[in-house]
Structure formats: C-alpha cells, structure tokens
Amino acid sequence: PGNGCLVLNRTDSNEKDVIAGMEEFIRKFMQMNPEEAAAASQKAWEISRIANWNTLFSYYSEAYRFALEKSEERRDQPRDYTRILEATEVQVRKPFQAPVWKDIYVQSELPERIAYLKELSSNLWWSWNSEAEFLFRRMDPTLWEEVGHNPKRLLEAIDYKRLVVLADDEVFLDDSDRIYREFTEYLARPENRELPSVAYFSMEFGIHPSLKIYSGGLGVLAGDYLKEASDSNVDITGIGLLYRYGYFRQKLGPKGEQQAIYEAEDFSQIPVEPVKDGNGNHLTIQLTWPGRTVKARLWLAPVGKVKLYLLDTDFEDNTHEDRAITHYLYGGDSENRLKQELILGIGGMRALIALGIKPDVYHSNEGHSAFIGFERMRHLIEDEHLTFEESMEIIRASTLFTTHTPVPAGHDAFEEDLLRKYISHYHTRLNITWDQLMALGRCQDDYERKFNMSFLATRFSQEMNGVSQLHGHVSRGLFSRLWPGYLRDELYIGHVTNGVHYSTWVAPEWEQVYEKLTGKRHFDLCDREQWAKIYQLEDEKVYETKMKLKKRLFDNIRKRLQSDMLERHVSPRTLMNISSHLNEKALTIAFARRFATYKRASLLFRDLDRL
C-alpha cells in the first residue's frame, strides 16, 4: 500500500483471488498511521497524473504490433489444441450394448516328425531354394497350385491324413531332413561384422508372388537385393509397407480390355509375423497428422538371414480413411501417395528406433523414402543438439540413393499446400524457415514449383546411382539442373548395373548342368575357376537346355491362354488356332513391363522394318 497502487493479474477464472487480493490491500491501508496514509495517497495521486491514454496508448500500440508479429510467425505452425476444462462426468445410457469382435486364429498341428516344416514355411528362404520349394510342391501338387505356391497356406489346408502318410515316408523324410539341416546351417553362419550395417528403404519388395508387395522391376531388384545380402551374410534391415490388396492381378475382358482384380490378403496366411513389444502387444509407431494420430503396426518377413520389417495402417486404432493408406501399392490420389511415403520414411525411421536398430548406412531405393532425411535431422537437432548444417553433413555422409526412372514423369512431386497440411511443423524443428524446407525438394528453374521427392533424396545423399551405365548418364542429365554451372560428368551420380539373384532366377535344369560341369552342388559366383568352366559347355548342351525351358514356357502360356479365353467365352476354334501357331522354335520377343505411359511401350514399334 505504501507504493500507492496495487497490480492484480486478473483472468477469466481467478475472480476469488482478485477479491481476496483487494481485501488484503484495503485492510493494510486502513492499518496505516496518518503519515503513512498521506504519503501513500500522494503517490497514488502522482501515478494517476501519468496513467492516462495519452501516455498509455503508445504502449498499447507496441503490444498490439508485437501480437500481430507473433500471429504471423504462428501462421506456418500447427495450431495448438484448445484448452479443455474439466467438467463433471456425465453418464450417458447407451440404447444397446455394442458387440466387441475379436480375431481368433485356428492353427493346424503337424505330426511331430515333420513339425519343422512350419518353421521352414515361415522364412522366405524356401522361395529361392528350388529343392525346398519342390518339397512343398510334392506334398500335394494340386493343392500347391490352388494356394498360389504359398507353403504357409498349404500346411493349413492339406489333409491331415496326407501329413501322416508323409511323416512315415522315408524318402520324403530323408529329403526334408536334409533341406531343414541346410536351412539351419544357413541361418547359423556367423555375421560379418567388418561391413557396415544398412537400412534399406523401398516402397516395394519382390520376393515371391505369395507376398504381394511389389509390381515391377524396382520391387524385384529390392527383393533380389535382400536375398543376395542374406546369401552374402551382409547386415541389412529392410523397411517397407505391407499392403492389404497389393497390386492388382490382370485379366482381359471379353473385348480384350484390361480388368484389374484386387484380392484382399489375410496376413495370417502369408509369410509375415507380428512384431511384439515387451508386454506381448503388437508393436506400433505413430505419426501426428491434422487433428489425429495415425498408427502403423510392424510386421516381420524373414528373408533368409535378413529381416524385412513392413508397416501397415489397416487396423482398428485408425480412422476409416487412414486404414486405407496401405491398401494398395501406388493406389489412390496424390494425397494418399504422400501419406504412404510419410509412413515409409518418417514411420520407417521411428520403427528402427522402436526396434533398437542403429544402422551405419541408409539406402533409399528410389525417392519414395526421402522423408527419412527429415526424421533423422529432427532427431539430430532435438536430441543431439546439432545445428542444421552439422546434421546435414552427417546425413549426407551416411545416405545412398538409387534412382530407377529415366523420365521426369516417373518421379513423385507434391503441391506445397498438400505438404503444409502434413509437415508444416517440421521447419521449426529443424531450425529453418518454411521456404528453406521447400527448397530442399525444388529446383530454381522448375516452373511447376512442386516438391520433388527425388530432388529431396538427392540433396540428402552423398552417393547416388542409376541402374545401368546408360541410365547413369541419363540421370546426370536429368538432375544436372540442381547444380547449375557444373558439367554433367562432374556430378557425383554414378551407376551400378542391375543384377539378379542367382538362386531365384536360375532354373533347376541349369543348376543340374552347372553341377555336372563343376562337380559342386552350388555354383559359387565369386569363384573365377567355376566361371571359366562355363566355356567348356558344348553348344549343343546349351541349346538343348534352352529349348527344354522354352518348351516349358510355351506349355505354360498355352495353359494360361486356355484358362483366360474360356473365362472370356472365346470359341474353341479360335483357341485352337492361337495355340497351334505358338511355336517354341520361333524367335519370340516379349515386352515384360507394365504399360504405364512413362514406360514408353510404343518403342516396340519404333523400327518396324527391323522388328
């Protein structure tokens, strides 16, 4: 009271505190002696002379200007949720009791003597071991075709009486014991700790048709990459998405038009298993999006010694819209594609952290997973307290980017407004402006000004490669505008020619030829002496083996033609006419690519005279 005034902080909810403060102030003033009261009154009068609008308005204007500046800064930031006041709990009587549905899985038991077949069927190692695949096929050849060459479904559907017969078949047991022994010895090989560990991110993995998470060459390369890593004992962890419908199965309609057939996948019948947390619950990661949190479950697909972790959003914790994110490979509109790539990149990084995996190198197979750079940088800045520039150096030094597409149309690009909807908060976490964030995925002379995922992946990578020598040359031209003033051949974009996984793509007939030639059951690709023996093969043997395989190919084509044409109600006369003109001795040219526009299928007819 001696100062002549009291300042009370008044809000909408502290009325009692304000009243108590005023009462206390008045009480103390009344207890003053006359001299103290006179001095306090004099100070109060002096304060009243300066507390007028002529003096205070300048401060009011300054406060208003400051508020406008802060409002402008918050424009690019996600809005805070409104503070919710606690209210008295209200009991709402439900008109009915909603049923609670739970999944129940019934597992068939195998005879103890061949119980290890369940373990063998759960690891995709069988998909590139021809003897293991033939072992499952011979259990029931007809059923094997019906279940789509899926041993997990085979063991669920096969008649138990047949299993009992097999468990007493000495020839079958000798073969199955030997194959299982090879499998366990394969997995027991000590890991090679001298090479760096790698996290391999890809939108698709082509490992086997029973796991429908691929559509073309990019996925097949990724699948072969993991298989070869397993064979070579390299420490690689795969990160991808698990799709409910995957890519469509193509059929031809009555008029020859394409029909896309989507078939929902039952995750309990494919070679994946849920990843559990410490409490035995399905492990999930989450991303915060506008007004909601999206969760993704983790699944493990063992690929020999390599672990492939797959994420999916199709479960009850998510909204109907978000459950559909991982329904289709490359499905939906541009916004759904962005969601998929956020799940793959940011969600994939959070999955690695949840699993306790700390790779030395991060490999992006195409630009779909480029958001891993944002999430890694956020971690380095927020948790390791590094600057943006320091974080960029660390990320670039440990990131590799493989590009596949030689034309601009094949590279994903998104509108700025769409990105602002989902990652508007990231620039503040990286201590940069929104424009600086956008510049990471743009080119200065890009008239569309879209955010290009391949540009982002390029800027986050120290090494970048095409998939052939020619493609490397084309890619240097395609990305050269990111570095104006440099010559094409001065760029750090190289090439690694695509290869294939030997055991997946070499037919058993050729394996028998190589075994007879080298005297060894398995052809060692790193043994130059074995390669030298290839030149000892007689031309007749090469031609004979090739024609044997070609005949098998044409038999399969006739079989598929018959099945497809009967469904289209094609006349038997037409079917017989087509089948009779298929000649395995004729030169046959096939176009084994998807008919997407940027694939340029019209190149087939570019030189008709030569064709």
Question: Model-found features: residue ranges?
Answer:
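Catalytic cores of carbohydrate-active enzymes across secretory and cytosolic contexts
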Residues: 1-611
